[in-house]
Amino acid sequence: MLDPNLLRNEPDAVAEKLARRGFKLDVDKLRALEERRKVLQVNTENLQAERNSRSKSIGQAKARGEDIEPLRLEVNKLGEELDAAKAELDTLLAEIRNIALTIPNLPADEVPVGKDENDNVEVSRWGTPREFDFEIRDHVTLGEMHSGLDFAAAVKLTGSRFVVMKGQIARMHRALSQFMLDLHTEQHGYSENYVPYLVNHDTLYGTGQLPKFAGDLFHTRPLEEEADSSNYALIPTAEVPLTNLVRDEIIDEDQLPIKMTAHTPCFRSEAGSYGRDTRGLIRMHQFDKVEMVQIVRPEDSMAALEEMTGHAEKVLQLLGLPYRKIILCTGDMGFGACKTYDLEVWVPAQNTYREISSCSNVWDFQARRMQARCRSKSDKKTRLVHTLNGSGLAVGRTLVAVMENYQQADGRIEVPEVLRPYMNELEYIG
């Protein structure tokens, strides 16, 4: 959520920055609501002051032996007017907040302006795509050859966009997640966490999934039953529970940065993806991901983004997978991000790069929703922290990349050296 003071005092500047994202801010409506808020605020404060004054007069009149009934009636009437004014103000403030919750984050100044993914800017490349001297098989064909990917069984159990993994393919999937966790915890300084896969609505509001993206989630009960404490949603990413661990907390600055990682399944309805990537593991309703989250001082967040992106890159480099790094343009960034790098891995069967990691600096956008603050040791003042999140990596898509990039002419799949300790030193699948 954006700073309310910024929306009040600099709406035109905010609107200009949001326009870079393709978001039209209704400045006139915001101004009208703000003017109304000021009037109601003053009216409420005046009624409160008048009621307090009259209440004090009752005691004074009583001490003088005067009839207090007229004053008592007046105080009661003022109380009713005050309650009505407060209710009207609360309704207006709720309307302003609901609007604020639908406004995306401001893009950082260095983010390239653009409309969609076609305007993203490539930053660098690592590795050279392998040249094959045989017909390339895609991961679905390879998975079926080794009885490792069973989409038909998943359709029987659940439906489309699910998979049953078996045998050595399932083992490699597990090995990838273990390798990623070990790398991030042992070399990159993250603490491993196990988190709930179901979260409440406060948690989803904290990281920005609600109210705007309710349709992308799997809910245990209809969304309108929000007040019920047992109404949960499956997590779309471990970013949600990990980041919310600091909700309503004040953290001493010398405890920052906080670096957390978790391996979880992720659940997404893919509501806007009908007809896209219908074959294979690229776009699933349920997929595994190793997530990285950092909680940092505001002045450290841009450097932390570079560091976190480097941590995701290291996974790909150690696996020997060619990839490219791009900076997302304003029109392609996620709702809460102020700056995002995507890593795209080479997928031979598609002859293209596909997203495998997204690393974002969210600035204080989530922290304001969560009221997550840090305290300076010198002056004891508090301020909002900055939060960052990144995929390190999406496990299923990494499996796709390994299977296709390491395939052999006879259909066997070479196991990357860094994964062999997790697979009893197995060199080939098949």
From Swiss-Prot:
Q: Which pathway does this chain act in?
A: Aminoacyl-tRNA biosynthesis; selenocysteinyl-tRNA(Sec) biosynthesis; L-seryl-tRNA(Sec) from L-serine and tRNA(Sec): step 1/1
The EC number(s) attached to this protein equal 6.1.1.11
The record's section on HAMAP family has: Ser_tRNA_synth_type1
Q: Which InterPro entries match?
A: aa-tRNA-synt_IIb, aa-tRNA-synth_II, aa-tRNA-synth_II/BPL/LPL, Ser-tRNA-ligase_type_1, Ser-tRNA-synth_1_N, SerRS_1_N_sf, SerRS_core, tRNA-bd_arm
In which compartments does the protein localize? Answer: Cytoplasm
Name of the gene this protein is made from? serS
The Gene Ontology biological process terms listed for this entry are: selenocysteine biosynthetic process; seryl-tRNA aminoacylation
Domain notes from UniProt: Consists of two distinct domains, a catalytic core and a N-terminal extension that is involved in tRNA binding.
Assembly notes: Homodimer. The tRNA molecule binds across the dimer.
The scientific name of the source species is Salmonella schwarzengrund (strain CVM19633)
Cross-referenced PROSITE patterns:
AA_TRNA_LIGASE_II
Pfam families reported in the protein's UniProt record? Seryl_tRNA_N (PF02403), tRNA-synt_2b (PF00587)
Domain of life from the UniProt record: Bacteria
Provide the residue positions that the database annotates as binding ATP: R268, S269, E270, E355, I356, S357, S358
Q: Does the keyword Aminoacyl-tRNA synthetase apply?
A: yes
Which key words tag this protein in UniProt?
A: Aminoacyl-tRNA synthetase, ATP-binding, Cytoplasm, Ligase, Nucleotide-binding, Protein biosynthesis
Task: Please write the reaction equations for the catalytic activity of this protein.
Answer: tRNA(Ser) + L-serine + ATP = L-seryl-tRNA(Ser) + AMP + diphosphate + H(+); tRNA(Sec) + L-serine + ATP = L-seryl-tRNA(Sec) + AMP + diphosphate + H(+)
What is the main EC category here? ligase
Mind listing the GO molecular function terms for this protein? ATP binding; serine-tRNA ligase activity
Instruction: Please state what the protein is called.
Output: Serine--tRNA ligase
This chain's function reads: Catalyzes the attachment of serine to tRNA(Ser). Is also able to aminoacylate tRNA(Sec) with serine, to form the misacylated tRNA L-seryl-tRNA(Sec), which will be further converted into selenocysteinyl-tRNA(Sec).
